[in-house]
C-alpha cells in the first residue's frame, strides 16, 4: 500500500516579546541569553544587559531573537557614531566601546585556540591603527527600484541583499569618503542606471581609484562626467564592462609601499583593507619569522608579494606560492620592479596536496602562511616535511587558525607567540598571527 506523504506541521513560532538576561557574546559579537536552557542569539545585545527580544528563528538547539528594547544597559554600551548603523551591515560592534571590542576579540581568539588546538598562552599586545577613516577599499552596491526607477547607492543591509543608502561612511578613508556623494550624483543621471553593476573604491599611495562595473556601453557624456570627477579629485578611473576587462580611462595604476617595497596592483586585486595595520602586520611577521641572510623562506598564499618581497630583502632566497595565476605574474613583476632578484613565484592549487611540485621538493628554513578564511587544511599537514624550524601563520579566521594549529602541534611544533591584529575596528572580524617553532 502506497504511503501518502504528509508534510510535518511547522512549529508555531512564539513571537511575543520576552525579557531575558544576556550572559556573554558569541564569536561573531551577538549577545547570548538562554530561553528554556536553549541559547538565544541577539544581535546588538551586550553581556549583563536585560533586554526585551522577539523570536525570529527557533531550532532544536538554538534560537535567534530581535532586539526590541534595552531594559538595563551595559556600562560598555555606547551610542553608535554612524547614522547608518542600524541599517548598514558593515560595522556591527559600534554599540560596544572600543576597549571592550578589543577585549572581546582577544578573548575570542584565546577561547578558540584553547578549545580546538588545546593551546592557552598569553597574547602579545594587539596590533592597532586608527579606529575611524581606516578603510582604503570598499565596494559600493548599486540597485535600481523597478517601480520608482530610483538608483540606490550604498552598502548591503544586515543579513540582507537590500541596500542601505550611504553617501557618508566614517570608517572609509577620507579621500574615498568624499567621493561617495559625488559619484552617486553622477551615476543617478545616467540614462540606463539599471545597467550599472557596482563601484569599487581603493586608495593607493598615489591617490584614490574609482572602478565602475557596467553591463552595457556608456554614453560619451557619461564617461566624460566620470573622467571630470576623477580628474578633479586626482583619482584614477577604471571602467569594467561585462567582459571583466579593466580599462584605465584616467590617472595611473595604483600602488602602495610597504617596508621599502613598491607594490602596484589592479583595483580588483586583493590588498589588505587597513594600510596602517597591514604595515605593522608585515613588520611583526618579519620580526617573528626573523629571516637571516643565509636562509630560505617559503611564503604560501603570497598574493602580490605583500610579505614575500619585504622578506626577500632580508633572506637568502624566497619562494612565493599562490593559487591565482594573475597574482603570481604580478608578484614576479613587482619583484623585478623593486630589483629583487632572490624571489621566485609559482602558481599552485594550495587546497590540495602539493607533492610533486618542483618548489615543494626544496627545503626551507622558515615558512609563512597567509590563507583566506577557509584556512590551509589542504596543505597544513605537509609543513613539517618542508624542513622549516619556524612557521608564522597569519589568519583572518580564528576558527580555521585553531583547526590548522592542531595539525602543526601534531607535527612537533610548539606555539610560542599569538596575537590579535585589529584590521577591522567596530566589526567582529578578527585578524591574528601565530608563531610556531621546533626546538
From Swiss-Prot:
Record keywords, A-Z: 4Fe-4S, Iron, Iron-sulfur, Metal-binding, Methyltransferase, rRNA processing, S-adenosyl-L-methionine, Transferase
Protein name: 23S rRNA (uracil(1939)-C(5))-methyltransferase RlmD
E.C. designation(s): 2.1.1.190
CDD domains, A to Z: AdoMet_MTases
Domain TRAM: 10-69
Known function: Catalyzes the formation of 5-methyl-uridine at position 1939 (m5U1939) in 23S rRNA.
Gene behind this protein: rlmD
Class in the EC hierarchy, top level: transferase
Binding site for S-adenosyl-L-methionine: 272, 301, 306, 322, 349, 370
Record-level Gene Ontology MF annotations: 4 iron, 4 sulfur cluster binding; iron ion binding; RNA binding; rRNA (uridine-C5-)-methyltransferase activity
